[in-house]
Amino acid sequence: MQSTESFHALPTRSDVEDPNERRKIQNRIAQKKHRQKMKRRIEELETKVNNQCQTSNWTSHAPTDSCQEQQFLDNTDFGLMLEDDLLYRELSASLDGAGLTAVAQMHDSPRPNQQQRLSVSGMPSSPTSTSNVAQRGLSIGDHSSASNHLSSLSLVPGSTEGSLPTRQHDNLCNQDLRDMVPEEKMSRILKVIQDAGYKDMDSFMTEYYVRDFDASSHVSAVQRQSRSRRLRGFLEQLRVGAESWSDYEAHDYQQEISKSAEAIYAKELDVFSTTTLGENASFQGLASLYRVLQSTVGSDIENHLRHEQSMMQRQVSEIVHRQVYTFNPAQC
């Protein structure tokens, strides 16, 4: 164990500017607090078990009842010991996942009072309790068999029994999904979506992109990222993939994309006409609009405007020709 002098010689977070060193110091502080918390927890459990054991010895004189009470206390203490060990492993895993690598050292070094927790306050284990532990496939020094037995215990005191097996089952299901072929994976996802109350994948995606979620929720933050960053790539992949679809499959998609483009184009022209052009729009205003759109959109708009300009000139020529023919048919 580290001496008091060497501990006080360690620098504090305020004395270090390197982020890695600051994380190491923060890790050491978290380890110290966790060890203190676990030590207090162990002392409370040992005191509680001692009191219960003494009370049972004073009030019960029958040998059979004493053995059953002692077996219950041993099993209770053993279960609480494993629950505390699970808490310790959960905290270590969470700190290690956050980049605090020094937590891994705690797994290698023995923690205080680890052996004492296997017995009740130093009392010799009864044959009943020893055989019970052996039936469970556990021993004092066998950590591998103990870790296998953790699946039958709850993670924290007061939690529902079987929460850890549920987590392991979820991990296995996720691994199975990753190993599936695309057809089976999509079938599983579609079934989950339908079980959640959605008619199909399209209704699910529509609600994801259109629905107004609570601004403080996690799904709202993910939705904003999808709208602002990932939707463009999604539409691009959809446009490229639609080229290989049949005409029947691509018809509705192309029609809706055309409507969207027309709506966006009309809105932009309306905004431009109200802010730049006056009521008497002329060819100069049209030329100005042409230059703006050419610089912002590109050659597609240029070709479109040329076509519109030629159509307008043709209509003007037809109107002029009609008027000349009306007033002087002989010249025509």
From Swiss-Prot:
Factors inducing expression: Conditions for carbon-, nitrogen-, or phosphorus-starvations lead to very low expression. Increase in pH results in gradual reduction of the gene expression.
Q: Where is the composition biased (Polar residues)?
A: 111-134, 160-170
Q: Which residues cross the membrane?
A: none
List this protein's GO terms for biological process. zearalenone biosynthetic process
Where does this protein reside within or beyond the cell?
Nucleus
Q: What does a knockout show?
A: Impairs the expression of the zearalenone biosynthesis cluster genes and results in the loss of beta-zearalenonol and zearalenone production.
| Source taxon at top rank | Eukaryota
Residue ranges, compositional bias (Basic and acidic residues)? 14-24
Q: Where is this region: Leucine-zipper?
A: 45-52
Using the record's annotation, list all stretches that form the bZIP domain: 17-50
Q: Which GO terms describe its cellular component?
A: nucleus
Provide the residue span(s) of the region labelled Disordered.
1-37, 106-170
Which segments show compositional bias classed as Low complexity?
143-155
Query: What UniProt keywords are attached to this protein's entry?
Result: Nucleus, Transcription, Transcription regulation
Which parts of this chain are annotated as the region Basic motif? 21-43
Picking any one GO molecular function of the record gives: transcription regulator activator activity
Family as reported in the entry's similarity comment: Belongs to the bZIP family.
Q: What does this protein do?
A: Transcription factor that specifically controls transcription of the zearalenone biosynthesis cluster genes.
Q: What is this protein's name?
A: Transcription factor ZEB2
